[in-house]
Amino acid sequence: MADIDKLNIDSIIQRLLEVRGSKPGKNVQLQENEIRGLCLKSREIFLSQPILLELEAPLKICGDIHGQYYDLLRLFEYGGFPPESNYLFLGDYVDRGKQSLETICLLLAYKIKYPENFFLLRGNHECASINRIYGFYDECKRRYNIKLWKTFTDCFNCLPIAAIVDEKIFCCHGGLSPDLQSMEQIRRIMRPTDVPDQGLLCDLLWSDPDKDVLGWGENDRGVSFTFGAEVVAKFLHKHDLDLICRAHQVVEDGYEFFAKRQLVTLFSAPNYCGEFDNAGAMMSVDETLMCSFQILKPAEKKKPNATRPVTPPRGMITKQAKK
C-alpha cells in the first residue's frame, strides 16, 4: 500500500493536463507506480461508495470516451475542469482510441481528488474479457506491462454500476434488464465482480433500446437484449422516475432521445475511431433537473478515403423522422 501513501495527485493531474494545446496524440508517460497507486486508491473509494450511486444536481453527464484523450480534455474545457463542475461518466473509458491510459488515469485522479463531486460508472469495456481484445491490453503491454493491465482489472471490478440523480434520473451504461424489478437488486450486487455473460449486471452494461421492438428482443451484439418504448415507460412509472440516461451506442448528434424523450443516449467521443462524423455530447442537469446538451462538433479533417462509404458499426443509431 506504499503506492497510495506517497501518491502525489496534484502532480499527476498537472502532468496529464500539460499536453492541453499540444497536437493531439502526444502521450503522457506517468511512472508505473503512480498508475498502480491511482488504481489502488480509486478502488478503495469505489468500494467505500454505493454500487448504486445517489447523486444530486447540478452535474454534467458524459457518455463513452474510448481512449480519445484529447476529446476528453475538450469536454472539460467546455464543461469546466473539476471542481468547477460536478461530473458523472457512464463508462467505456478504454479501448478503440489511442490513449486509453491517459484517459483512465486522468479520470481516476479526479475521482481521488474530488471523491464527492466526480463519479465514474462501469461500462462494458471496463471488463477484462472485452478490453483484452479491443485495445487496452495491447496499450498497457506496449507502454508498461501486463501486470499493470491486471491491476486495472482489479480496479474496474469495483466500479459502481448505476446512479440515480435526485431520485428522478436513472443512469447506467447500457440499459434496462428483464430481471430488474427493484433497485435493491442492484444494491445487492457484491464487488469486486467480473461482468457475467447474462443476468442483471450484464444487461445494465450491454442492453440497447430499439424502436422496432415490443417488449424485449434479441440483441445483434450477441449479448443481452433490446427493449422497446413500452418497457421504458413502465420502468419509469413503477420507480417514479422521469428519465433514463445511458450511453453505449454511437449517435450522430452526440445525444438522441427515445420513447418520447423518456430515454436519452449520450455519446461523448466525436469522430469516433476516426471513422464517423458523429458529434460528441455532454448533458448538463441543473438544480431544477432541466437537461441541456453541450455539443463537441467532430473535428474538421480531410479523410484519406473521403469517397468511400463507411461501414457502420453494430448498434449505430441513425437519425430518423419519427412516424
From Swiss-Prot:
This is Serine/threonine-protein phosphatase PP1-gamma catalytic subunit. Its cofactor is Mn(2+). Belongs to the PPP phosphatase family. PP-1 subfamily. It comes from Rattus norvegicus. PANTHER family: SERINE/THREONINE PROTEIN PHOSPHATASE, SERINE_THREONINE-PROTEIN PHOSPHATASE. Binds 2 manganese ions per subunit. One of its GO terms (cellular component) is kinetochore. Protein phosphatase that associates with over 200 regulatory proteins to form highly specific holoenzymes which dephosphorylate hundreds of biological targets. Protein phosphatase 1 (PP1) is essential for cell division, and participates in the regulation of glycogen metabolism, muscle contractility and protein synthesis. Dephosphorylates RPS6KB1. Involved in regulation of ionic conductances and long-term synaptic plasticity. May play an important role in dephosphorylating substrates such as the postsynaptic density-associated Ca(2+)/calmodulin dependent protein kinase II. Phosphorylated by NEK2. Pfam families: Metallophos, STPPase_N. The active site is at 125 (proton donor). It catalyses: O-phospho-L-seryl-[protein] + H2O = L-seryl-[protein] + phosphate; O-phospho-L-threonyl-[protein] + H2O = L-threonyl-[protein] + phosphate. Residues 302-323 are annotated as: Disordered. PP1 comprises a catalytic subunit, PPP1CA, PPP1CB or PPP1CC, which is folded into its native form by inhibitor 2 and glycogen synthetase kinase 3, and then complexed to one or several targeting or regulatory subunits. PPP1R12A, PPP1R12B and PPP1R12C mediate binding to myosin. PPP1R3A (in skeletal muscle), PPP1R3B (in sliver), PPP1R3C, PPP1R3D and PPP1R3F (in brain) mediate binding to glycogen. PPP1R15A and PPP1R15B mediate binding to EIF2S1. Part of a complex containing PPP1R15B, PP1 and NCK1/2. Interacts with PPP1R3B, PPP1R7 and CDCA2. Isoform 2 interacts with SPZ1. Its EC number is 3.1.3.16. Mn(2+) 1 binds at residues 64, 66, 92. Inactivated by binding to URI1. It is found in: Cytoplasm; Nucleus; Cleavage furrow; Nucleus, Nucleolus. Isoform 2 is expressed only in testis, in the late spermatocytes and early spematids (at protein level). Keywords: Acetylation, Biological rhythms, Carbohydrate metabolism, Cell cycle, Cell division, Centromere, Chromosome, Cytoplasm, Cytoskeleton, Glycogen metabolism, Hydrolase, Kinetochore, Manganese, Metal-binding, Mitochondrion, Nucleus, Phosphoprotein, Protein phosphatase. The modification Phosphothreonine is found at residues 307, 311. GO terms for biological process: blastocyst development; cell division; circadian regulation of gene expression; entrainment of circadian clock by photoperiod; glycogen metabolic process; neuron differentiation; positive regulation of glial cell proliferation; protein dephosphorylation. GO terms for molecular function: lamin binding; metal ion binding; phosphatase activity; protein domain specific binding; protein kinase binding; protein phosphatase 1 binding; protein phosphatase binding; protein serine/threonine phosphatase activity. Mn(2+) 2 binds at residues 64, 92, 124, 173, 248. The modification N-acetylalanine is found at residue 2. InterPro entries: Calcineurin-like_PHP_ApaH, Metallo-depent_PP-like, PP1_catalytic_subunit, Ser/Thr-sp_prot-phosphatase, STPPase_N.
